[in-house]
């Protein structure tokens, strides 16, 4: 659904993003209590907004409102007649627009601080007591804007909370969206539900019915849809939703590129085709992919080769599909999620390319297809909930993500059948042990990498000189930041022993304890 379509069905809070690293969390927190929220850049012109929000939240940001090139909101938001909440930079923006001095504070406030609620009658602070909040600012408001009152303070922020209740404009200097603010979620609920009067109707049960009806209306009674599936949760949920909407008029294609997990193609065929009843074609193109990867060591080149080859294979197989009604395929299904949308529309704009994302965007232009993205408004946790409601198994719904380029970017250096086989078997053993230990659902993603270095070892009385496996496991809520998972040493010892003894060509196993940032989740 587009933002306009969603807002026509669900009450929506508009989050205007000034570039804070926490902006996406505002949207997540609101949805956690069933209020839909849409994030747009702070430069959004209200005249171009074709829907009316129930309220507006101004996010934090890394700028100073008094700087020459500082971003400022379209003042027309104050004419919408809806409640407004400014967070951190957002509070300073409200003060600045109201002709109040904002400048550099004598002391910075980064990290936890004690919030003192000074006006308990303020609806924003209903059921919010003196508590710990998360600060991240150096600038501060020097005077109280005309028509506003102080609602909260901290040791270093005399205007930690301000409000003009007649105009329903509120500002807070701290970040309620982060979990470090112990009562932040209550405050956001107060704003969205009690002040903005947004209905708490956003849930996956309602989404299913709404989205299926939208798909049927968009596709019509005759058109056919094609889409790629990988066996991952996103493509599987999107495919099942499409199957529920139009049945066999949806054609799923699974391409075996030779760098999938162990027995992946057979598993997908059984799970999606036989288990979920999805109209599925499985294509073995492993030789084609691996031949093109010969001699390639640069990770970006690997990604592009796999992406381009995928498009070629997909187009070729799509041409073989003959719709029962004799008409051409008109639509392409893509499992885009909301974090992808956020990355493209955030105030910072498209960030510097760290890695090329493997997707099927090139198919649209080449095949002249119309795009359907039924999951584009959803976060990962919402997709998982949706999957279970659609009858997809818990094991599949909670499966760890797997990159589009597959094991090709987990074999550092040249990708050969032999190297893929080593990495694949090590990964299988690692995941098997994680499942046996009951840790799989505690970990967001785990995998084994084959490093392009050799290490001396001893097996029996023989000297060995073989390769190194690096294990990686992370915990995260959104994959934008991540911490390494703290396995017990005994667990790592067991996994390392199995890999060295059961995987030919491996002499040493290491464990990656780098967080994101500075590292990315994948090694390539």
Curated annotation (Swiss-Prot):
Residues that coordinate or bind XMP: 303, 461, 516, 522
Matches recorded under CDD domains: GATase1_GMP_Synthase, GMP_synthase_C
Cofactor(s), by name: Mg(2+)
Primary location group: cytoplasm
Biological role: Catalyzes the conversion of xanthine monophosphate (XMP) to GMP in the presence of glutamine and ATP through an adenyl-XMP intermediate.
Keyword Magnesium among record annotations: yes
Subunit structure: Homodimer.
Gene3D superfamilies documented for this protein: 3.30.300.10, 3.40.50.880, HUPs (3.40.50.620)
Residue positions of the active site: 88 (nucleophile), 175, 177
Reactions catalysed: XMP + L-glutamine + ATP + H2O = GMP + L-glutamate + AMP + diphosphate + 2 H(+)
GO biological processes: GMP biosynthetic process
Keyword Ribosomal protein part of the UniProt annotation: no
Organism: Kluyveromyces lactis (strain ATCC 8585 / CBS 2359 / DSM 70799 / NBRC 1267 / NRRL Y-1140 / WM37) (Yeast)
Enzyme class name: ligase
Gene Ontology MF, one: GMP synthase (glutamine-hydrolyzing) activity
InterPro entries: Class_I_gatase-like, GATASE, GMP_synth_C, GMP_synth_GATase, GMP_synthase, GMPS_ATP_PPase_dom, NAD/GMP_synthase, Rossmann-like_a/b/a_fold
Keywords, sorted A to Z: ATP-binding, Cytoplasm, Glutamine amidotransferase, GMP biosynthesis, Ligase, Magnesium, Nucleotide-binding, Purine biosynthesis
UniProt domain GMPS ATP-PPase: residue ranges: 202-399
NCBIfam families: guaA_Cterm, guaA_Nterm, PRK00074.1
Record-listed E.C. numbers: 6.3.5.2
GO cellular component: cytosol
Pathway membership: Purine metabolism; GMP biosynthesis; GMP from XMP (L-Gln route): step 1/1
Protein name per Swiss-Prot or TrEMBL: GMP synthase [glutamine-hydrolyzing]
């Amino acid at each position: 659904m587009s933002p306009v379509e969603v807002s026509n069905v669900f009450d929506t809070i508009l989050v205007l993003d000034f570039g804070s690293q926490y902006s996406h969390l505002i949207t997540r927190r609101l949805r956690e209590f069933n209020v839909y929220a849409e994030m747009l850049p702070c430069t959004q012109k209200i005249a171009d907004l074709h829907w009316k929000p129930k309220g507006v939240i101004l996010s934090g940001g890394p700028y100073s409102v008094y700087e020459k090139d500082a971003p400022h909101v379209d003042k027309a938001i104050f004419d919408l007649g809806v409640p407004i909440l400014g967070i951190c930079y957002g509070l300073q923006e409200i003060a600045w627009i109201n002709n109040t001095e904002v400048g550099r504070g004598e002391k910075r406030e980064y990290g936890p601080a004690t919030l003192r609620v000074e006006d308990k009658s303020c609806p924003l602070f209903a059921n919010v007591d003196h508590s710990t909040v998360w600060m991240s600012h150096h600038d501060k408001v020097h005077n109280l804007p005309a028509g506003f009152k102080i609602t909260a303070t901290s040791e270093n922020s005399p205007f930690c909370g301000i409000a003009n209740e007649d105009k329903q404009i509120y500002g807070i200097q701290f970040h309620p969206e982060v979990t470090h603010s112990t009562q932040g979620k209550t405050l956001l609920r107060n704003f969205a539900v009690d002040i903005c009067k947004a209905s708490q109707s956003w849930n996956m049960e309602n989404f299913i019915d709404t989205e299926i009806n939208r798909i049927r209306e968009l596709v019509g009674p005759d058109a056919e849809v094609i889409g790629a599936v990988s066996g991952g949760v996103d493509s599987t949920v999107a495919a099942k939703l499409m199957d529920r909407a139009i049945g066999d008029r949806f054609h799923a294609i699974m391409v075996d590129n030779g760098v999938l997990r162990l027995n992946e193609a057979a598993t997908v065929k059984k799970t999606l085709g036989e288990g979920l009843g999805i109209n599925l074609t499985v294509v073995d193109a492993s030789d084609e992919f691996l031949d093109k990867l010969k001699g390639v060591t640069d990770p970006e080149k690997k990604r592009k080769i796999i992406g381009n080859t995928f498009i070629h294979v997909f187009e070729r197989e799509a041409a073989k599909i003959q719709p029962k009604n004799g008409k051409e395929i008109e639509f392409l299904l893509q499992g885009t999620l909301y974090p992808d949308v956020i990355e493209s529309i955030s105030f910072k704009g498209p960030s510097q390319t760290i890695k090329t994302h493997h997707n099927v965007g090139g198919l649209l232009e080449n095949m002249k297809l119309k795009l359907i993205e039924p999951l584009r408004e959803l976060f990962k946790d919402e997709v998982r909930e949706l999957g279970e409601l659609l009858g997809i198994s818990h094991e599949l719904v909670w499966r760890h993500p797997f990159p589009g380029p597959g094991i090709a970017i987990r074999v550092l250096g040249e990708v050969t059948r032999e190297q893929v086989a080593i990495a694949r078997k090590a990964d299988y053993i690692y995941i098997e042990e994680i499942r046996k230990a009951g840790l799989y659902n505690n970990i967001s993603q785990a995998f084994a990498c084959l490093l392009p270095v050799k290490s001396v070892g001893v097996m029996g009385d023989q000297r060995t000189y073989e390769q190194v496996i690096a294990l990686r496991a992370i915990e995260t809520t959104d994959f934008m930041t991540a911490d390494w998972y703290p396995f017990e040493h005994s667990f790592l010892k067991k996994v390392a022993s199995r890999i060295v003894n059961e995987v030919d060509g491996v002499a040493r196993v290491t464990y990656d304890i780098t967080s994101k940032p500075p590292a990315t989740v994948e090694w390539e």
